Amino acid sequence: MEFRTATPADVPSLYALWTAAFDAPLMVPVYETDGGRLDRTVVAVLPGPTPAEDRVVASVCWTPRTLVGLPCPTGPDGSTTTLTVGGVANVASAPDQRGRGLVRLALAEAVEQMHAAGMDASLLFTGTPGVYRPSGWETFEVPVTRGLLLPDGAARPERSSATVVARHERRSRTEPPVPTTFPAWSPDLPWQDLATLHDAFHVAPLTTLRTAVHWEHRIPLWYSAAELLTARGPDGSIVGYLVVELEGEVLRVRELAVGPGGATTPERHEALDVLALAARSLAREHGATRAEVRLPRVPAAAVLTDTLLTAEDRETASDATGMLRPVRRSTAEIDALRATTSSPTAGFHWPGDYL
């Protein structure tokens, strides 16, 4: 058994491993958005008679990502630090090789690479945290609220005017099932408009600082099954947006951003109102009766939730699929970063920034 960095010759066997290990059609397209991916892919290989016949039996990939860190104690109010993290993904082992510790060894090699590359910490998302905890990763939790959608006849908040309207940014029927470049929705929708709102809405610990590559390539992939609703001002400018996914009877809220100001300022409240009403209408069209709201603990999220869900039968839970591990930073700092999701700083990580 050999542990090493992947080469172009390993790609067919690597992809075959992932096909056998996962039912995840986005795995390869997302992986291929990373130009330096092979240099950051650790593989366990069973040598074959020739290099072309080597068999990849385990893998761990990582990609650099910049996150918002803890509040800066010496800077102006609201200033934060940043961290460069190694985002771990595509962790796999062949079914006939499991139980040999291959993933643990590949993770250790990946952490060594991250340390050499100057990563502060490592981030991953998983439904099996027990696999990673022995290697130093620990979970963090973000809030999730579930409940019944408000009925059609529910009173809508009073508005002084009707200057903001919602638009469903529908996909073109000619687009492939999995878009690989922006726009994922209407062709006249520039990603820069969404990015401006996103960047100003919630700058908090654990949030990814998105680049143009994220917006142009990764966001369309992670939200390829989602619907985008925008709130538009009288001049057509985007003053808010909401990303939702419909799965059976459940509407899942994946991302929200609205313009500057408090949640109760007229234009911001109106944007939240029309986005929630449009989401309820979309849910009715698809037969959904319940919603799952995964948003940070901020006033705008509370307003949206109250306009989506009935007050009764709500369940407050958490999503604990995210995990962090220190690399060059101290354990105490990374523990403090994990704890921000339940603090007033409302740390958060968006699904569109999964790895």
Descriptions of predicted regions:
Residues G136-P157, R254-L355:
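Active-site/acyl-donor-binding loops of N-acyltransferases
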Residues V43, A52-R65, V85-A92, G236-L246, ...:
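Conserved beta-strand in the GNAT
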Residues H115, D120-R133, V293-A302:
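Conserved beta-strand-loop-alpha-helix junction that forms the acyl-donor binding cleft
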Residues T82-P95, E249-P266:
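Conserved acetyl-CoA binding element of GNAT-fold acetyltransferases
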Residues R4-A6, V56-E112:
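Well-ordered mid-protein domain cores that form the structural environment of catalytic cofactors
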Residues E138-G261:
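Amide-forming acyltransferase catalytic core, primarily the GNAT-like/NAT-type
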Residues Y15-D77, P205-L228:
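Active-site rim helix/loop that mediates acceptor-substrate recognition in acyltransferases
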Residues V88-S93, G99-E112, A116, L124, ...:
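Conserved acetyl-CoA-binding loop-helix of GNAT-fold acetyltransferases
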